[in-house]
């Protein structure tokens, strides 16, 4: 997770990857990995203000009509304060339903390059222990990551899919590129309720990558035409 003293992946990605490796060797887990994971977690600073947003939400604000589009618009506009308020309203109105995680994941995938790997691992980490009291922590995790860079506009879907990833994979130069490709492939094969939206954004990203690499106007792999 550290490359030249600079983190190249989110802690959720790192710990989920370690969990996956250890899951294959439960009878004799690697002491090196266990030690690394323990030291890594110990070096992280816990977020301390996650609950404050919920505590500060006025009760009359929860009773108002709740529209998912208000949360989506706030995220799109990059208004951090409004995003927190709308997310809290949706979360409280839905009684802590994890559905909000998929809503935010679809938005984050408008930037597959920056968020694809993180979103896959974040959803998987929650699914490993899908407890209601953990939903808000994961909501904050996604919101804080999305805040790092502006979201592009929602994209139009294309006919591209995992079968068109070959040329992109062959051009990978950094480990983060492999993480992204593996993540979007797994997301494509998932069964999330917002999967159509996930596929729309992923197909657009694949199309753009292949346009750059093979010059086809529609972004398709000529071997699959």
Residue ranges of each PLM-predicted region?
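Mature, well-folded catalytic/scaffold domains that follow N-terminal targeting or propeptide regions
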Residues: 1-225
């Amino acid at each position: 997770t550290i490359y030249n003293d600079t983190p190249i992946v989110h802690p959720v990605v790192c710990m989920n990857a370690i969990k996956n490796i250890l899951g294959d060797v439960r009878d004799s887990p690697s002491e090196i990995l266990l030690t690394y994971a323990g030291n890594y977690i110990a070096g992280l600073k816990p977020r301390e203000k996650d609950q404050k947003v919920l505590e500060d939400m006025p009760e009359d604000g929860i009773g108002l009509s709740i529209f998912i589009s208000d949360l989506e618009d706030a995220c799109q506009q990059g208004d951090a304060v409004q995003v927190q308020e709308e997310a809290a309203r949706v979360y409280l109105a839905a009684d802590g339903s994890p559905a909000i995680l998929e809503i935010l994941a679809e938005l984050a995938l408008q930037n597959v390059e920056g968020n694809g790997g993180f979103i896959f691992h974040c959803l998987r980490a929650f699914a490993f222990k899908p407890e209601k009291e953990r939903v808000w922590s994961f909501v904050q995790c996604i919101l804080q990551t999305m805040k790092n860079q502006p979201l592009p506009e929602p994209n139009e879907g294309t006919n591209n899919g995992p079968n068109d990833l070959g040329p992109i994979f062959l051009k990978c130069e950094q480990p983060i590129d492999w993480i992204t490709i593996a993540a979007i492939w797994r997301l494509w094969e998932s069964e999330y309720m917002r999967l159509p939206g996930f596929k729309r954004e992923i197909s657009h990203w694949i199309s753009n990558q292949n346009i750059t690499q093979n010059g086809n106007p529609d972004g398709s792999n000529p071997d699959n035409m």
